[in-house]
């Protein structure tokens, strides 16, 4: 899962003025999809699935009380699942788009709100998402989402900057508390794995990749050791499961054989050994099925 927080500069995500440029850019694949008869994904927010670009621009541009001319007015969060993660989100475009909206609403934006340490929930954030299916320059199908987030909360009273580093202190200059991006990325990854059942390899985790990029030599070595240990434990667990799966058919076959033998035994005729004396036979009779002394054995079948 690749999640980025963008905004600033003079390019597509320039954010000190109107968000018109961003909303226009985020509609770039709509016309092509309509030409091909494919469904277009509209903007959405926490409670609505269909929002026009005009409304998005109006709401973001007018939610900037007490922001100066050069202050950021909004940010853009990009959520890009890998191909394997997409498979866990659904089999069709429609299923995956619905899963992405749920993930953005229930997890990404909730973790975003919590990241400021101000007791906020996703309902307090002014945001609008847009789902895309193809990245520029990519030939293959590749779904991802862009989320325009206002610098101010929905009440237009609190400044929220995800670019302000978290220090653990209550007051950090003009912005209280800052934003813990590392914790945000980690929580988004964990909640995705939990809600989709995705079995993430240790080398694919945010902590591992972040350490490989930014960690010290000692931290990198320790993280590699951790990944090797986790992979070894997973392999041993898989071996145990394979061994159990191989044994179960033989155990089942043995139980069936025992059951069959039990059924056969229950059908064996019972021999009634109670002798009956035949007074009209001679003592030394040698007729078949008869014993000397006038005793004859009868077999009774149940």
Feature locations, PLM:
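N-terminal nicking endonuclease/strand-transfer module with a His-rich metal-binding environment
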Residues: 1-302
């Amino acid at each position: 899962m690749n999640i980025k927080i963008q905004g600033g500069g003079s390019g597509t995500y320039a954010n000190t003025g109107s968000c018109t440029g961003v909303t226009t850019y985020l509609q770039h694949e709509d016309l092509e999809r309509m030409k091909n008869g494919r469904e277009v994904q509209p903007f959405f927010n926490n409670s609505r699935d269909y929002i026009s670009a005009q409304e998005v621009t109006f709401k973001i541009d007018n939610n900037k009380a007490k922001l100066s001319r050069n202050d950021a007015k909004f940010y853009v969060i990009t959520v890009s699942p890998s191909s394997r993660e997409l498979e866990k989100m659904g089999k069709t475009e429609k299923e995956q788009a619905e899963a992405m909206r749920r993930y953005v609403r229930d997890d990404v934006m909730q973790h975003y709100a919590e990241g400021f340490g101000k007791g906020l929930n996703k309902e307090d954030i002014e945001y609008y998402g847009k789902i895309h299916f193809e990245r520029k320059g990519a030939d293959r199908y590749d779904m991802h989402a862009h989320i325009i987030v206002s610098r101010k909360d929905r009440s237009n009273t609190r400044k929220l900057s995800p670019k302000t580093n978290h220090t653990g202190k209550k007051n950090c200059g003009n912005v209280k508390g800052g934003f813990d991006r590392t914790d945000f990325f980690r929580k988004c990854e964990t909640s995705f794995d939990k809600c989709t059942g995705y079995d993430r390899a240790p080398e694919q985790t945010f902590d591992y990749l972040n350490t490989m990029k930014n960690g010290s030599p000692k931290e990198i070595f320790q993280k590699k050791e951790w990944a090797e240990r986790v992979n070894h434990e997973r392999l041993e667990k898989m071996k145990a499961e394979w061994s159990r799966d191989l044994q179960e058919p033989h155990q089942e076959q043995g139980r069936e054989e025992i059951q069959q033998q039990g059924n056969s035994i229950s059908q064996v005729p019972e021999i009634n050994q109670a002798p009956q004396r035949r007074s009209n036979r001679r003592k030394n009779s040698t007729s078949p099925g008869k014993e000397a002394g006038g005793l004859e054995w009868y077999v009774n079948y149940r």
